[in-house]
């Protein structure tokens, strides 16, 4: 990574902890937990990281998450991510975790949360990286399941700062989760949601008006709706954009088509994030580098993007 990019203090606001599970750690955890994997070795697994759409990725993502069983596993996953953050001068993180991915496999909620939380606290003490954890609901599951997850989480209310919405976007509009988001907000939690990645601009409107989110995760399709763009600019609603993810999942055919810098120059508060870096070929630093190499991002633009990420923090 370029030294001048590395030198910029940055926050990461769109990162799924389960998506930072590198193949090497995945194999190590499988061995620790005596789980047989369908891949012969790390190279075979990496070769499987070729996706035509979001769903193909998610199928592999959930299969990979199956190796996470104990508090120590979740600690190791989170700690490995934080070490990469330290190396790239990421000074604040607001990662997502997907409790339902694990509780549906019989892993107790508190096992997941304790491992992640301890690593985040150690990251603050030992690495100087501050944090705010976000509990994310899976949108392909019914809202009643999200309510159950929120209920399970409330005894640990001080461990996380907000709720999010992720997983398969097409066919699962934000309006399906209006009640559970209202409940979460009534408990004093922040709200964010994935919208406008594969889904249409209407999903962004719903996230803003029905879920009353403070940030939009992805949001790149907002550019298709001029009225929506104007609102996002006027209200300075942050978009947590994930360039390498967008290419890997065919949201854009290649980086040269990406609209993040167009949005930046129009006054949108866009930020650079890695989404699921183990699967998409890079962490925050690699995403910044890709914008420089393929879109000609200037040092001044990089500074604005980095500052946007710090300004858009919820914690």
From Swiss-Prot:
Cofactor binding: number and manner: Binds 1 zinc ion per subunit.
Enzyme Commission number(s) from the entry: 3.5.4.2
Recorded catalytic activity of this chain's protein: adenine + H2O + H(+) = hypoxanthine + NH4(+)
Single GO biological process annotation from the record: adenine catabolic process
Name of protein: Adenine deaminase
Source species: Ectopseudomonas mendocina (strain ymp) (Pseudomonas mendocina)
Residue positions binding Zn(2+): 14, 16, 194, 275
Keyword Flavoprotein belongs to the record: no
């Amino acid at each position: 990574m370029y030294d001048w990019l590395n030198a910029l203090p940055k926050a990461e606001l769109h990162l799924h902890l389960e998506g930072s599970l590198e193949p090497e750690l995945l194999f190590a955890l499988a061995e620790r937990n005596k789980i047989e994997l369908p891949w012969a070795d790390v190279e075979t697994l990496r070769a499987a990281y070729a996706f035509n759409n979001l769903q193909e990725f998610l199928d592999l993502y959930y299969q990979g998450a199956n190796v996470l069983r104990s508090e120590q596993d979740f600690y190791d996953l989170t700690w490995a991510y934080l070490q990469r953050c330290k190396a790239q001068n990421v000074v604040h993180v607001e990662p997502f975790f997907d409790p339902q991915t694990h509780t549906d496999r019989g892993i107790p909620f508190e096992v997941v949360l304790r491992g992640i939380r301890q690593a985040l606290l150690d990251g603050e003490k030992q690495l100087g990286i501050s944090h705010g954890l976000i509990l994310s609901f899976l949108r392909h599951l019914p809202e009643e399941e999200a309510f159950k997850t929120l209920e399970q989480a409330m005894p640990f209310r001080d461990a996380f700062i907000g709720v999010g919405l992720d997983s398969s976007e097409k066919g699962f509009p934000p309006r399906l989760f209006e009640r559970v988001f209202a409940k979460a907000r009534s408990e004093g939690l922040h709200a964010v949601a994935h919208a406008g990645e594969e889904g249409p601009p209407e999903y962004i409107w719903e996230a803003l008006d029905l879920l009353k989110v403070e940030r939009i995760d992805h949001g790149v399709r907002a550019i298709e709706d001029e009225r929506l763009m104007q609102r996002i600019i006027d209200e300075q609603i942050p978009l947590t954009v994930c360039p390498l993810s967008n290419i890997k999942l065919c949201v854009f055919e290649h980086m040269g088509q990406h609209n993040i810098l167009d949005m930046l120059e129009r006054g949108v508060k866009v930020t650079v994030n890695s989404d699921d870096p183990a699967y998409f070929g890079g962490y925050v630093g690699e995403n910044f580098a890709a914008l420089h190499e393929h879109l000609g991002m200037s040092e001044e633009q990089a500074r604005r993007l980095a500052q946007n990420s710090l300004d858009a923090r919820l914690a």
